[in-house]
């Protein structure tokens, strides 16, 4: 099968049904598993559901939704916290549908300049100006919104230096109580720098510390009978409390991992939050296999050892790990981790302040991830049972496999084999096979070779699927039939999955081996949804492998490595186009204009140098 535009259908109804109303960040993935969009929400369910309304006005949203193959979320305590995490994810994943696909130097920042009377301002680009930078922010409007808030809270100038130098009397900002007018010496340097220091602490996330300092200053001003100054501090405190959102993401921890644990219905979720440089840099859910009735502390001890100390893990141990329960009454585990890091490592469960909020946040995400996984498992079990009934299986279906072929113009052919059981994808059993020694573009031969690679040496009956899906029509299915006719063992049930004319989900034709009769299923049948899921996963896995192989070839690709381009044609191409770089940049029409180069060969040359 040539790489096409087959797109996995995202089950938005099922996802939204169990989505929380809490604030957080959502990530959208395409069929290749790449993050294509990151967003934040005050109400996750309300925001995410807006993408799947029947009428969506924005063309960008329509295009984006068509590309969604899966989604996941990270719950946060506040919308402000979600904003910071959203920015972290955008930097990490660089999603193509987010606006900010650029380097850090192009992200906007707030700058507090190094000046006798520092100013707060908007900055983008190289950091040549001296001062303190705060950010980056996800977009310019976020910076301007923050500057507007800061101007209301701290009377610090935001004017250009040239405007500042030209003043002979206070401007309107002074009248609005948004600047102390240091330009004309209305305030002292100490008074101005006092506000600068408070603004800096606020930008560092030390909100409560700012309020505490203002309270002390207000009380001191009252004691000194400076009631006007005391009133100014009082108003400042009121404004801060009104706008304050305690954000646990910007605490004082420099390097901290926080772990949450949730268990239920035979499943365990361990949730990791990674805090670096005072920010939540990311999160991840793990679902370890845990024997029944294993105590929580034992589960966590085993997880910590495997997560941080495995020879193959390669993870950096943080200086502090916050846990939901105590795991080391004898401190042995902390000593082992400290030895590995060559610095003291704290493992603690009794925490306060920001760490307690991190701990609570990790627990929220653990519960959310567990509920989501249990829902997926329930859906998978229901669909598997439906398929079992359709195929009239007398015993439960234990294992299903699906094959797909991916290539571009017959080059870098890759076959995929994905495996599903009653709980969903079994990714540890996934396999890819590089297909060589066939006529380029011969999908039938590619399928035959892939089956031989997978099953020729399959000696353990437990690894043989109950059902084998073949992504393709009767021709591809016939290759599987021919192979298993001579196999000498009990063959799996073979089913061909042929695409409809428009390749739209729901229009597939399911073909049984032997009789080649079609299996009638409605568009909303659970069994069909399962088959689509398996087929789409096989397609995704094949395309991903093919692209990786093609990209690898591209790095070393030369005309000598392209089938059909011999010495004479190579010489003609270089003579007419001028050099290898010109060949790489040439269009198909330009390549086909070279004497001796056919249209089909021009296409082969063109695609050999491209990833898309």
UniProtKB/Swiss-Prot annotation:
SMART domains on file: GIYc, HhH1
InterPro entries: GIY-YIG_endonuc, GIY-YIG_endonuc_sf, GIY-YIG_UvrC_Cho, Hlx-hairpin-Hlx_DNA-bd_motif, RuvA_2-like, UVR_dom, UVR_dom_sf, UvrABC_protein_C
Keywords assigned by UniProt, alphabetized: Cytoplasm, DNA damage, DNA excision, DNA repair, Excision nuclease, SOS response
Transmembrane feature ranges: none
Recorded superkingdom: Bacteria
GO cellular component, one term: excinuclease repair complex
Single GO term (MF): DNA binding
Annotated GO biological process: nucleotide-excision repair; SOS response
Cellular compartments annotated: Cytoplasm
Pfam families: GIY-YIG (PF01541), HHH_5 (PF14520), UVR (PF02151), UvrC_RNaseH (PF22920), UvrC_RNaseH_dom (PF08459)
Main location: cytoplasm
Domain (GIY-YIG) ranges: 21-99
Assembly: Interacts with UvrB in an incision complex.
General function of this protein: The UvrABC repair system catalyzes the recognition and processing of DNA lesions. UvrC both incises the 5' and 3' sides of the lesion. The N-terminal half is responsible for the 3' incision and the C-terminal half is responsible for the 5' incision.
Record-linked NCBIfam families: PRK00558.1-5, uvrC
HAMAP family: UvrC
This protein's name: UvrABC system protein C
Originating species: Idiomarina loihiensis (strain ATCC BAA-735 / DSM 15497 / L2-TR)
Upper lineage: Bacteria, Pseudomonadati, Pseudomonadota, Gammaproteobacteria, Alteromonadales
Designated gene of the protein: uvrC
């Amino acid at each position: 099968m040539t790489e096409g535009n087959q797109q996995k259908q995202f089950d938005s109804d099922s996802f939204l049904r169990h989505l929380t109303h809490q604030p957080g960040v959502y990530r959208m993935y395409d069929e290749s598993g790449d993050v294509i969009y990151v967003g934040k929400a005050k109400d996750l369910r309300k925001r995410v559901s807006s993408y799947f309304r029947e009428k969506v006005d924005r063309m960008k949203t329509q295009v984006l939704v068509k590309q969604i193959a899966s989604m996941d979320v990270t719950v946060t305590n506040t919308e402000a916290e979600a904003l910071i995490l959203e920015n972290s994810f955008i930097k990490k994943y660089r999603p193509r549908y987010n606006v900010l696909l650029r380097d850090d130097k192009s992200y906007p920042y707030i700058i507090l300049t190094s000046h006798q009377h520092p100013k707060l301002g908007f900055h983008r680009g190289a950091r040549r100006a001296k001062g303190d930078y705060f950010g980056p922010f996800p977009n310019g409007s976020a910076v301007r919104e923050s500057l507007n808030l800061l101007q209301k809270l701290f009377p610090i100038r935001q004017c250009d230096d040239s405007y500042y130098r030209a003043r002979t009397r206070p401007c309107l900002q002074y009248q609005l109580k948004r600047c102390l007018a240091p330009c004309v010496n209305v305030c002292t340097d100490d008074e101005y720098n006092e506000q600068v220091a408070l603004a800096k602490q606020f930008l560092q996330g030390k909100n409560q510390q700012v309020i505490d300092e203002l309270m002390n200053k207000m009380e001191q001003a009252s004691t000194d009978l400076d009631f006007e100054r005391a009133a100014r501090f009082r108003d400042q405190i009121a404004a801060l409390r009104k706008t304050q959102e305690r954000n646990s993401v910007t605490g004082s921890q420099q390097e901290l991992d926080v772990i949450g644990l949730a268990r239920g219905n035979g499943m365990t979720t361990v949730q990791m939050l990674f805090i670096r440089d005072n920010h939540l840099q990311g999160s991840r859910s793990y679902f370890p296999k845990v024997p029944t009735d294993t105590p929580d502390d034992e589960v966590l001890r085993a997880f910590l050892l495997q997560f941080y100390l495995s020879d193959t893990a390669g993870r950096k141990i943080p200086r502090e790990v916050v846990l939901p329960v105590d795991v080391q009454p004898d401190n042995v585990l902390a000593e082992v981790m400290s030895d590995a890091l060559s610095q003291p490592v704290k493992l603690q469960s009794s925490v306060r302040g920001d760490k307690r909020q991190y701990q609570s946040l990790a627990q929220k995400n653990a519960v959310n991830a567990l509920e989501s996984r249990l829902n997926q498992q329930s859906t998978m079990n229901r669909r598997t049972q439906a398929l079992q009934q359709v195929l009239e299986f007398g015993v439960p279906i234990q294992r299903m496999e699906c094959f797909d072929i991916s290539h571009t113009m017959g080059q870098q052919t890759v076959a995929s084999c994905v495996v599903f059981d009653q709980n969903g994808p079994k990714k540890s059993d996934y396999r890819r096979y590089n297909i060589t020694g066939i006529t380029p573009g011969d999908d039938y031969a590619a399928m035959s070779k892939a089956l031989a690679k997978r099953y020729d040496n399959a000696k353990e009956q437990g690894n043989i699927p109950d059902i084998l899906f073949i992504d393709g029509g009767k021709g591809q299915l016939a290759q599987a039939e021919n192979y298993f006719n001579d196999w000498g063992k009990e063959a799996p049930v073979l089913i061909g999955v042929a695409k409809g004319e428009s390749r739209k989900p729901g229009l597939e034709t399911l073909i049984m081996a032997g009789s080649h009769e079609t299996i009638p299923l409605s568009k909303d049948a659970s069994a069909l949804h399962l088959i689509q899921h398996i087929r789409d996963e096989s397609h995704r896995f094949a395309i991903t492998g093919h692209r990786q192989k093609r990209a690898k070839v591209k790095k070393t690709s030369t005309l000598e490595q392209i089938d059909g381009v011999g010495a004479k044609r190579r010489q003609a191409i270089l003579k007419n186009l001028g050099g290898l770089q010109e060949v790489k940049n040439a269009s198909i029409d330009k390549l086909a204009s070279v004497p001796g180069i056919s249209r089909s060969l021009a296409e082969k040359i063109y695609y050999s140098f491209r990833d898309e």
